[in-house]
Amino acid sequence: MAGQAPNMLAPPTDDELLHAQADLWRHSLYFVTSMAFQCAVKLGIPTAIHRAGGTASLPDLVAALSLPPAKLPFLRRLMRLLVHSGVFAAADDTTGSAGTYRLTPLSWLLVEGEGGAPVVDGHPCQVPVVLAGTSRHFVEAAMGLAEWFRKDVPAAAPPSPFEEVHGAVLFDESMASLHPEVDTVFNQALAAYDHSGFATVLRECSEVFQGVQSLTDCRGGDGAAAKAIVEAFPHIKCTVLDFPRVIGNKRGDGVVNYVAGDMFRAIPPAQAVMLKLVLHHWSDEDCVKILTQCKKAIPARKDGGKVIIIDIVIGAPSGPLLEAQLLMDVGMMVATKGRQRDENDWRDLFKKAGFNNYKIVKKLRARAVFEVYP
């Protein structure tokens, strides 16, 4: 006689319920950590600590940031949370209660150069990424998720919650219908995100670029990545392709050539085409269209033809890296028609676009580099 099935509805123990209640508070108030993070960035706390020589006390911060002295106890509470979440580190104890703080690798990314310059010590400042991700427009779109799920839309790629709430498509000309500052914030965030970690790519994955004679950087923006490639590999002739509104009046300088166009229609021919943090903004159907154009732009594999893709690949071991990948995936769902993909998803896209093989280089933590061959 078969044994009795276990009771899956057995009530939790008192201890489990107490832990669950703490988890409920934590999940319900996660946004407070994000807003505290935004507050630190808007106040300029990372930059103030950096300019103080790497450590700063609460009185130092109050003075440097021109805050009312009466706010010192409240600043202590803010910093205590941000020390716990890893944004800052306590220089004098483990909790941050004593009130002297130093930068962590995370807050180092939020230091602004002199005069508000976007780069300090060679590291692209990521302040715009924080301001966009915690902006009212992004948060309002995320708050519309439940209504978005309930709405019956037959299209294979329905409008994103961002589009439904604000009537504009992120990074599209329709963003001009919103306040100009909103479009600027998101474009600055895209540029900062696009530039982040690329120096590491060139150091850790240099073999990907060796032997390449010419390269087209699709959606290459201001050409910073292309210029970095040429600096590291002077023999590579680089072309940047982006929308006319992005290219503007940029002209080739003998190092990088600029082409205004649409990657869905045509891509300037080159031995290699690079898509850096591009495809996760697009649906599977659109990705296949983009990759098909890439395939038309490159020669056969025997002649060195390949597509270089730098993007997130879901599949990190459980922990902060996987959580970051999953948060980025839902973030894409909120703001775009794209998504983050695991390696099987990427393989399916390559196959549908007519590519025969690929290699993957996993040296970039949450991201990876694909070399995709015709």
Curated annotation (Swiss-Prot):
InterPro entries: COMT-like (IPR016461), O_MeTrfase_dom (IPR001077), Plant_O-MeTrfase_dimerisation (IPR012967), SAM-dependent_MTases_sf (IPR029063), WH-like_DNA-bd_sf (IPR036388), WH_DNA-bd_sf (IPR036390)
Active-site residue numbers: H280 (proton acceptor)
Pfam family, one: Methyltransf_2
GO MF entries: O-methyltransferase activity; protein dimerization activity; S-adenosylmethionine-dependent methyltransferase activity
UniProt-listed Enzyme Commission number(s): 2.1.1.-
Induction info: Induced by UV-C.
Residues annotated for S-adenosyl-L-homocysteine binding in this entry: D242, D262, M263, K276
Keywords: Methyltransferase, S-adenosyl-L-methionine, Transferase
Enzyme class: transferase
Keyword NADP on entry: no
Source species, domain of life: Eukaryota
Gene Ontology terms describing biological process: biosynthetic process; methylation
Family: Belongs to the class I-like SAM-binding methyltransferase superfamily. Cation-independent O-methyltransferase family. COMT subfamily.
Protein's name in the database: Flavonoid O-methyltransferase-like protein Os11g0303600
Source species of the chain: Oryza sativa subsp. japonica (Rice)
